[in-house]
């Protein structure tokens, strides 16, 4: 039996020859044909292929790529770190605030506006509950309201109730992308009640229609209300010029409402709560900052005296067909303004019916030439400087040439032989020019002296009330006075003032020569109920007490003497000191003198002054225009009412009755 050989290991054969002849010349093993590898196109390492130059193989280095990737990653990391620092450190508070804003919702709790009362606590301006009528315009789309013309239908229903134009409401309701619109602000509870009842009717009809298989259209479902307050003036137009008014936002826009807006407005509060998905999170708690109500303002005004003054001036302005008029009543001892009335006026409850020209306070904002009521300042200067006494003789010719002007009195007369007291009683322009000419050795010196007294009396300076739009008057420097002004300013032409300044002049004389700045506010009452008096007004002595008393006696002659121009201001039982005025009026439209300013100023009782009353009427066109004739009766009417209201005792003595004239040769 033949011996068995062990299995052979398979060993790769030699490389194949390059050609067929070579392959044929080699023997092959019998057991297995030899398989030879085909030559590679690339030469083995260390060998160079035939016909080719030897070129080394270069492999790409990974280092630049790694560096580029590392740099990019580093920059990304730096950006992340910078952003992290910005969010966590630099702008942490800002992002926290944004997060809190998204997390929490807050709404404002409006502070209750303070009241304005008269000196007795009677409300002149107060706030009552009201509603802002709002809407969600999206709820008026055909999809939500189930009505194709919901905005038009709703506007037609709401317009008569709100008193607005239906077209305007339609426009507000036809904004489907908006979720909030204000249809009307500060409507009374009665208005909202009407709308609410109407909503109930439509909601009931919609429910029945839907139950019957209909669309259930409801064109008022998107109407809502927001509680607020509304400013009201219980006495209508009484003292409207003083009080002013508020705008549509409830902010003071005129008068004391504007001047004292900060005190009246208070501080709004806030309520903040957490929300999620637009819904309140009850477990997150609520942060509430309560609103602080505004302070109540107590005025110096007496409502009853204000009513009497306003009625008197309104009646006379209408009777005289005048442009306007004012009456001021002032406490001579304290400077407190008891009344400040304007005609025509306005009702701050309904500004839509008000004349724009009447919205201010003409008694403080009008500036005009006062005329003869200003002569009292000239007489004060003459007496205080000691250049004349009430009995000094003044010969008053029919005409007087000064500079390039020829001056005359209001009435034609022969030569008058008057005392200085008579010059004031008969309101002689010529006599006043002659008297004030004695104030200096030259006319320039006299001008300087007179100017200083006019300034002391407050001409050309604010009254001290700080009222919005108040005028300071016009008084040029004495070196700037024209030739004409040197002689017209002493009798009240060529300078300008407002009604409050005019009243203050007479209060200064009545108060013994001491000027007290007028006041309109007695004090404030805060949210704690404590009353804080207003600061005491500034005081300044203008003339001596002796001069003031002498002037008061001279002013009595204007009213009491049969030759005086103010006899219509007499009040039985009371001694009255006063002065008439009839000035040429500067027409702001025509730019020259046209028409007259009639006025009367005075105080009572003359022996113990308590009350000052000033009246002026601009451009009376019907009937008389002299101050003593049309303003004297108003003075009497208002002064009598004020004396009785304040329970002022009658005079206990007779007037001195200083001589008015003299006989030549005396």
Task: Please place each PLM-identified region on the residue numbering.
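Hydrophobic alpha-helical transmembrane signal-anchor segments
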Residues: 2-5, 42-43, 60-94
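Small/polar-residue-rich segments within soluble enzyme cores
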Residues: 3, 153-160, 171-293, 615
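Short beta->alpha transition motifs characteristic of CBS
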Residues: 127-137, 339-345
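Conserved, well-ordered alpha-helix/loop/beta-strand core segments that scaffold catalytic motifs
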Residues: 281-325
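Short, gly/Ser/Thr-rich active-site loops of penicillin-recognizing serine hydrolases
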Residues: 531-536, 632-666
């Amino acid at each position: 039996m033949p011996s068995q050989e062990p299995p052979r290991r398979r060993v790769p054969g030699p490389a194949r020859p390059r050609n067929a002849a070579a392959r044929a010349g080699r023997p092959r093993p019998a057991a297995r044909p030899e398989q030879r590898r085909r030559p590679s196109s690339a030469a083995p390492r260390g060998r160079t292929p035939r016909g080719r130059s030897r070129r080394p193989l270069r492999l790409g280095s990974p280092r630049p790529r790694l560096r580029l990737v590392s740099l990019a990653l580093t920059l990304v990391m730096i950006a992340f770190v910078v952003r992290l620092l910005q969010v966590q450190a630099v702008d942490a508070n800002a992002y926290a605030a944004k997060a809190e804003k998204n997390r929490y919702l807050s709404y404002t709790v409006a502070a209750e506006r303070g009241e304005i009362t008269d000196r007795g606590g009677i409300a002149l301006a107060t706030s009552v509950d009201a509603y802002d009528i709002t809407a969600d315009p999206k709820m008026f789309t055909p999809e939500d309201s189930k009505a194709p013309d919901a905005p038009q239908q709703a506007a037609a229903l709401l317009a008569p109730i709100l008193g607005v134009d239906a077209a305007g409401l339609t426009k507000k309701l036809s904004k489907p992308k908006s979720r909030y619109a204000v249809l009307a602000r500060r409507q009374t509870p009665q208005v909202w009640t009407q709308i609410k009842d109407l909503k109930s009717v439509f909601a009931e009809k919609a429910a029945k229609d839907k139950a019957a298989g209909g669309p259930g259209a409801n064109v008022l479902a998107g109407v809502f209300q927001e509680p607020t307050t509304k400013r009201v003036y219980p006495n209508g137009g009484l003292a409207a010029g003083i009080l002013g008014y508020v705008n549509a936002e409830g902010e003071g826009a005129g008068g004391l409402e504007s001047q004292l807006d900060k005190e009246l407005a208070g501080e709004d509060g806030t309520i903040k709560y957490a929300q999620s998905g637009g819904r309140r999170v009850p477990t997150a708690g609520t942060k509430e900052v309560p609103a602080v109500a505004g302070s109540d303002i107590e005025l110096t005004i007496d409502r009853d005296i204000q009513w009497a003054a306003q009625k008197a001036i309104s009646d006379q302005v209408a009777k005289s067909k005048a442009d306007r008029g004012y009456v001021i009543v002032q406490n001579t001892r304290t400077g407190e303004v008891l009344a400040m009335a304007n005609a025509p006026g306005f009702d701050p409850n309904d500004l839509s019916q008000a004349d724009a020209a009447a919205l201010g306070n003409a008694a403080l904002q009008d500036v005009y030439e006062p005329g003869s009521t200003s002569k009292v300042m000239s007489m004060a200067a003459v007496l205080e400087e000691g250049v004349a006494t009430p009995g000094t003789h003044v010969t008053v010719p029919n005409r007087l040439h000064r500079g390039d002007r020829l001056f005359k009195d209001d009435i034609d007369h022969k030569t008058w032989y008057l005392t200085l007291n008579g010059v004031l009683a008969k309101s002689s322009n010529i006599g006043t020019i002659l008297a004030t000419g004695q104030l200096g050795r030259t006319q320039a010196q006299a001008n300087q002296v007179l100017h200083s007294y006019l300034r002391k009396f407050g001409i050309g300076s604010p009254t001290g009330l700080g009222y919005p739009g108040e005028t300071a008057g016009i008084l040029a420097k004495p070196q700037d006075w024209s030739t004409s002004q040197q002689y017209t300013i002493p009798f009240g032409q060529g300078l300008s003032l407002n009604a409050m300044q005019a009243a203050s002049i007479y209060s200064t004389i009545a108060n013994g020569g001491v000027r007290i700045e007028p006041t309109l506010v007695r004090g404030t009452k805060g949210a704690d109920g404590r009353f804080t008096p207003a600061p005491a007004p500034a005081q300044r002595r203008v003339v001596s007490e002796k001069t003031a008393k002498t002037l008061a006696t001279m002013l009595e002659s204007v009213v009491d003497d049969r030759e005086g121009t103010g006899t219509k201001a007499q009040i039985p039982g009371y001694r009255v000191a006063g002065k008439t005025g009839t000035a040429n009026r500067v027409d702001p439209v025509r730019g020259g003198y046209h028409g007259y300013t009639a006025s009367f100023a005075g105080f009572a009782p003359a022996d113990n002054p308590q009350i000052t009353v000033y009246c002026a009427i601009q451009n009376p066109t019907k009937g008389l225009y002299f101050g003593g004739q049309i303003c004297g009766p108003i003075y009497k009417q208002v002064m009598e009412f004020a004396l009785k209201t304040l329970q002022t005792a009658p005079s206990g003595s007779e007037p001195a009755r200083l001589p008015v004239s003299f006989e030549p040769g005396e």
